Regions:
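Extracytoplasmic ligand-binding site segments that recognize negatively charged/polar headgroups
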Residues: 1-106
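Short secondary-structure boundary segments
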Residues: 24, 54, 114-115, 174-175
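Periplasmic-binding protein-like
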Residues: 46-53, 80-85, 91-92, 123-147, 161-178
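Short, hydrophobic alpha-helical packing/hinge segments within bilobed ligand-binding/sensory domains
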Residues: 98-99, 117, 155, 168
Length: 179
């Protein structure tokens, strides 16, 4: 996708989104269905079955909160957050941890970025990614060239590096959605 600011002050390197990472074996053992929506995750059957990143410690966690408020509107978004909180086992200190916990069979459901689950998928772990039917929060990682910075030549060299094929490949490998 084209991720460029109209005045060329910044450009996107890649995009990534929040996902529901589920361990299908654990769900089956606990008699739980695979959630298909955020509404599903608010049901009492999922109490203490979900881990998500702490929004105070993780940009991934903050992205989820922002996505709920943006996607559902402020009033309903905060209602979703409060109901989801009631089902939370705990909040992880990193965005990657809930995906890893689901992949390793520690929890049935981890809210994380699908990109964090990629390394586990090649080992045929019983995990899958669910994109809730209401939509997901997403973010773009970007590069900007600051005006009036103390090292303009170095900043421009970094800009050029970020726009190059090496960073593009890293972005594609990480998130699958390179700019």
């Amino acid at each position: 996708p084209k991720m460029v600011e109209k005045d060329n002050h910044w450009f996107g390197i890649n995009a990534w989104g929040g996902s529901v990472c589920v361990n299908t074996d654990l769900l089956r053992k606990k008699g739980l269905s695979v959630p298909r929506s955020w509404s599903d995750l608010l049901q009492s059957e999922f109490q203490d079955q979900i881990v998500m990143p702490n929004p105070r410690a993780s940009s991934t966690g903050l992205m989820f909160l922002h996505g709920f408020v943006q996607g559902f509107g402020e009033k309903k978004g905060w209602e979703v957050i409060e109901k989801l909180h009631a089902n939370m086992l705990f909040y992880a200190a990193s965005g990657a941890r809930p995906a890893a916990m689901a992949a390793q069979g520690e929890i049935p459901i981890g809210l994380s970025a699908a990109a964090f689950l990629k390394p586990f998928l090649k080992y045929k772990t019983p995990v899958s990614v669910v994109q809730p039917e209401e939509g997901i929060a997403w973010d773009a990682e970007a590069c900007a060239l600051p005006r009036g910075g103390p090292h303009p030549q170095e900043a421009k060299a970094f800009w050029d590096f970020c726009a190059g094929p090496a960073v593009g490949q890293i972005a594609a490998d990480f998130s699958g959605i390179a700019a």
